[in-house]
Structures are given as structure tokens and as C-alpha cells.
Amino acid sequence: MEKLFNRSDRIAQELQKKIAAIIQHSLKDPRIKTIITVSEVQVSKDLSYAQIFVSFLESDNNEKVKKKITILNRASSYIRKLLCKRMKLRIVPNIIFHHDDSFLKGNKISCILENLTKKE
């Protein structure tokens, strides 16, 4: 029987759940009090780094999004410390946050397609 997921994929899924819970319940910074969705986690093969892709409910202002990503990256050591307590890993990866704008791009494409169908 072959494995469907390798270890880094399983750890990425678990990190996604734990980081979403930490952001929602443990971060008390009022500057990021908005709905934050952890959309994807990519873990390096040696599990030393994790890239966390997040999207925000209010993501229309690019400067606000950059500030929120900066705040999350500054809080990454605190989030990593909480992850060390909640996960049984020998090495908890360093965390780097990135903005995931795929939902906005998909929404823009669907609006363009909708306008094209209305013109026909």
C-alpha cells in the first residue's frame, strides 16, 4: 500500500489548522482584527521553513494588506512559540506570511466572463 501523502504534506495540513486557530484566538493585536483565512501552507522538505498564505476579508486596500502581512510576520516568533507547545515536532518550522490574492483574481475573472456573456 503506497502512501497518499508524504510527511511534509501532513505537517502542512496540521500547521494550517493550528495557525488558523492561533490567529483567531491567541493574537490580540487590534490592527489585525479582521477575518483572516489561512488558505495554504507550503513546508520545505527539511521542515525548516513554512510559507503561510493568508487572505483577508477586507483586502481591497493594498497598503492595509501589506501592513497586516508585516504585523503577522513580526508576530511569527510568538506564533511559532505557541506552535511548539501545541505540536509534537522535533523542528517547528520558521514561519513566513504571504498574501494570497487568488480569490480576488478569480472574482475579477468571473466578472469579466459575466460581462462578456451579457454583451453576447
UniProtKB/Swiss-Prot annotation:
This is Ribosome-binding factor A. Pfam families: RBFA (PF02033). HAMAP family: RbfA. The gene is rbfA. Signal peptide: none annotated. One of its GO terms (biological process) is maturation of SSU-rRNA. GO terms for molecular function: ribosomal small subunit binding. Its main location: cytoplasm.
